[in-house]
């Protein structure tokens, strides 16, 4: 279960502590999302197109309810690029999941995310100090060590789809930096992306085979770990430089692996413990090091008053 973080309790924290808390909750949401997708797609409980549609539609409905409950909240300005990237990420990830195994999936997906967000950060003038680069190298090495036993050559189509998912997620994350109202922005993105997913489902109607369990897992993923989780991520991004935001996402695979041990009865291993220590220790080193250049989120994109 995701911890309950209310806006009032978060606002009372110091800025640095608030950013750490929001980032930690977002990473937990992403890891939980990974487990829900694994349960639904791995066992063929639902087809890829239906999974994506249910995730985006349920997320849009959940966020519409939350936004409507907020008094005096102005309607969000349409961000079609962010919505398109959200749809592309969900669709490409769902289809690639069926053709790329778990061990190969993580390096491709997170590699594409890192390259996209690092390129944007470097272009904006962000730079790591030497300890930051050491921490990043340790985190990447830990990820590769975690997944190395099961790495195999994926299909070319799977590589393209998973890489596209990573790039789309990187761009979607970058669009969230500097937003004044993460909730309204995320709600608007889901609202615009949902019809795209429904159109894709219509194209693949012949493969339609959701079970009740698969549909419930997709709805839980969309309404909670995607919808609410992405709001928390956008809130955290207000205070994270692009390169640091990229680095912290490397924590998702070990968190998901630990969740599988706790909730899916998978066996803990020394490999998981060592890799998790390397990844989390490396990320801590990245966050503790001072960055050179433009590190403010607004350096990449002008402040948005949405």
Predicted features along the sequence, with ranges:
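Glycine-/small-residue-enriched transmembrane alpha-helix faces in small-molecule transporters
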Residues: 1-53, 84, 88-92, 141, ...
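Transmembrane alpha-helices of multi-pass small-molecule transport proteins
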Residues: 2, 44-88, 112-120, 168-172, ...
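Helix-helix packing/entry segments at the starts of transmembrane helices
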Residues: 105-112, 175-194, 226-262
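Specific transmembrane alpha-helical segments of multi-pass solute transporters/efflux pumps
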Residues: 29, 70-110, 118, 138-145, ...
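Specific alpha-helical transmembrane segments that line the substrate/conduction pathway
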Residues: 50-61, 86, 94-127, 165, ...
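C-terminal-most transmembrane helix of multi-pass membrane proteins
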Residues: 2-12, 56, 250-306
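Juxtamembrane helix-entry segments on the extracytoplasmic side of multipass membrane proteins
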Residues: 15-20, 44-53, 74-76, 133, ...
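Hydrophobic transmembrane alpha-helices of multi-pass small-molecule transport proteins
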Residues: 63, 86, 128-148, 165, ...
């Amino acid at each position: 279960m995701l911890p309950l973080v209310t806006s009032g309790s978060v606002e009372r924290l110091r800025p640095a502590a608030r950013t750490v808390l929001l980032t930690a909750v977002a990473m937990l949401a992403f890891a939980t999302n990974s487990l829900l997708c694994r349960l639904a797609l791995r066992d063929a409980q639902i087809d890829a197109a239906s999974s994506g549609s249910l995730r985006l539609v349920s997320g849009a409905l959940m966020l519409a309810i939350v936004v409507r409950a907020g008094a005096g909240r102005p309607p969000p300005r349409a961000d079609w690029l962010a919505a398109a990237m959200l749809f592309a990420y969900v669709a490409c990830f769902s289809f690639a999941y069926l053709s790329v195994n778990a061990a190969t999936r993580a390096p491709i997906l997170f590699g594409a995310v890192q390259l996209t967000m690092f390129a944007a950060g470097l272009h904006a003038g962000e730079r790591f100090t030497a300890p930051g680069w050491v921490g990043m190298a340790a985190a990447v090495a830990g990820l590769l060590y975690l997944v190395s036993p099961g790495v195999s050559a994926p299909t070319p189509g799977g590589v393209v789809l998973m890489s596209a998912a990573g790039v789309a997620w990187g761009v979607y994350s970058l669009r969230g930096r500097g937003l004044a109202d993460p909730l309204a922005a995320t709600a608007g993105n889901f609202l615009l992306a949902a019809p795209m997913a429904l159109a894709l489902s219509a194209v693949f109607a012949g493969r339609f085979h959701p079970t009740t369990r698969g549909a419930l897992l997709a709805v839980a993923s969309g309404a909670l770990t995607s919808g609410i989780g992405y709001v928390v991520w956008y809130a955290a991004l207000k205070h994270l430089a692009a390169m640091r935001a990229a680095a912290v996402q490397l924590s998702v695979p070990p968190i998901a692996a630990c969740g599988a041990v706790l909730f899916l009865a998978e066996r803990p291993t020394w490999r998981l413990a060592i890799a998790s220590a390397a990844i989390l220790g490396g990320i801590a080193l990245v966050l503790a090091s001072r960055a050179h250049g433009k590190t403010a989120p607004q350096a990449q994109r002008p402040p948005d008053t949405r």
